[in-house]
């Protein structure tokens, strides 16, 4: 059933390109990979040392957190910090008002009608923070679970886990901006932040919120995260449709998903309409993220999003896909070819992950933000945005220009 009441009025992307819609737009126009030798956690002996890091001058966490909440910075991991930066940017881009961005003014929308849906990953603990505990628990180089529970845990600060719970990005975002509407956290790998946008669309469509902060972020350049990718043979140079491995990135995006009535009432600029959504799961995914080229779940999710939008495949002007140089890229391309008849070299297929890397839970929101920019800048009228996760999850959106 097509969505009739859901629009996007702001985006807050953050990544190797910097922070904000203009920064992402410039990077997309340049269309050059931003991967560089990692400046953090070097010398890990991995398949590649390339990474898409957020530039240090992109934002300062103290600038996006009110003074009353700054004590909490000590329990913020990079995933939380980037979520707060992305949210602040999105709110300002949409010209909304919250208790933090406009403390002296009445919030728009009503805090009780402002929801928050964010995707989050398996947040890795700080290596130095865990180092002391691990040393005590593994005196002979092998972890002794008895020592870990009895003595190792005593080396951790009491609040250490508050940095790493997947729902903490949404917790901090809702507290900082006074969002008291429906909230949810999606832990579905790379698809999490796009699924968060689909969740926000449904929340708004059923009338439970006027606007939602939807998206997600993740730090995939953390040494533990990079080691996970290395051990599962997923690291590489990030060449779309080449299966050479992905470049890890950090960042993501938050989108302002709003009801058409609310956006119109406040004379907001409508960047795009959300008209179709879908999600699914591959039953074939292997340890390295591999799936058969003809895995039907890819095409199924794309087709259902198009059907949900009430249009046909011939009405799609462009496809924005998560292809980042991993095995599942071939199945993405096979699905696009079977539905639309487009080859991997077709200029109507955009693969922006080469710009910002694989940001884990932030990837889907960056793909969605790219689609929003294409539409708002008049480069396409109707876009299919698709992302697949390393666990075989899929999500798709159909976004259209405002009538």
Show where each model-derived region lies.
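Short beta-strand segments
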Residues: 115-119, 187, 212-218, 257, ...
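Conserved beta-ketoacyl condensing-enzyme motif
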Residues: 8, 29-177, 220, 313-340
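ACP-dependent fatty acid/polyketide chain-elongation machinery
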Residues: 1-73, 94, 261-275, 369-377, ...
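Glycine-/small-residue-rich "gating" segment that lines the acyl/pantetheine channel
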Residues: 138-156, 198, 202-205, 218-265, ...
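Active-site-adjacent elements of ketosynthase-type condensing enzymes
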Residues: 47-56, 219-240, 254, 279-300, ...
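Cysteine-centered functional microenvironments
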Residues: 11-12, 66-76, 102-105, 149-160, ...
């Amino acid at each position: 059933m097509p969505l009739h009441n859901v629009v996007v009025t702001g985006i807050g992307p953050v990544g190797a390109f910097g922070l904000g819609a203009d920064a992402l737009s410039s990077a997309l126009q340049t269309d050059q990979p931003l991967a560089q030798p990692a400046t953090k956690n070097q010398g890990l002996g991995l398949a590649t040392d390339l990474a898409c890091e957020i530039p240090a001058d992109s934002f300062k966490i103290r600038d996006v957190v009110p003074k009353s909440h700054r004590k909490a910075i000590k329990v913020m991991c990079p995933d939380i910090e980037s979520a707060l930066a992305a949210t602040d940017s999105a709110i300002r881009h949409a010209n909304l008002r919250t208790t933090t961005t406009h403390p002296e003014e009445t919030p728009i929308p009503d805090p009780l009608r402002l929801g928050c849906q964010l995707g989050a990953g398996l947040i890795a603990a700080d290596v130095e923070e865990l180092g002391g505990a691990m040393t005590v628990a593994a005196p002979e180089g092998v972890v002794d679970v008895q020592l870990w529970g009895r003595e190792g845990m005593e080396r951790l600060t009491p609040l250490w886990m508050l940095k790493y719970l997947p729902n903490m990005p949404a917790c901090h975002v809702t507290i900082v901006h006074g969002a008291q509407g429906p909230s949810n956290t999606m832990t579905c790998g790379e698809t999490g932040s796009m699924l968060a946008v689909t969740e926000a669309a449904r929340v708004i469509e059923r009338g439970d919120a006027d606007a939602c902060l939807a998206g997600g972020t993740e730090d995939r350049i953390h040494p533990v995260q990079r080691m996970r990718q290395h051990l599962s043979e997923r690291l590489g140079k990030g060449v779309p449709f080449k299966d050479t491995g992905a470049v890890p990135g950090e960042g993501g995006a938050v989108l302002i998903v709003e009801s058409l009535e609310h956006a119109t009432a406040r004379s907001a600029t409508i960047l795009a309409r959300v008209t179709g959504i879908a999600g699914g799961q591959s039953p074939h995914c292997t340890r390295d993220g591999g799936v058969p080229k003809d895995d039907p779940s890819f095409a199924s999710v794309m087709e259902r999003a198009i059907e949900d939008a009430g249009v046909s495949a011939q009405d799609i002007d462009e496809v924005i896909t998560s292809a980042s140089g991993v095995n599942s890229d071939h199945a993405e391309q096979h699905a696009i070819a079977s539905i639309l008849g487009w080859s991997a070299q077709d200029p109507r297929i955009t693969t922006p992950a080469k710009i910002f890397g694989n940001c884990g839970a932030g990837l889907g929101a960056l793909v969605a933000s790219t689609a929003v920019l294409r539409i708002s800048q008049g480069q396409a009228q109707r876009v299919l945005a698709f992302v697949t996760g390393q666990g075989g999850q899929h999500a798709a959106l159909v976004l259209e220009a405002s009538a």
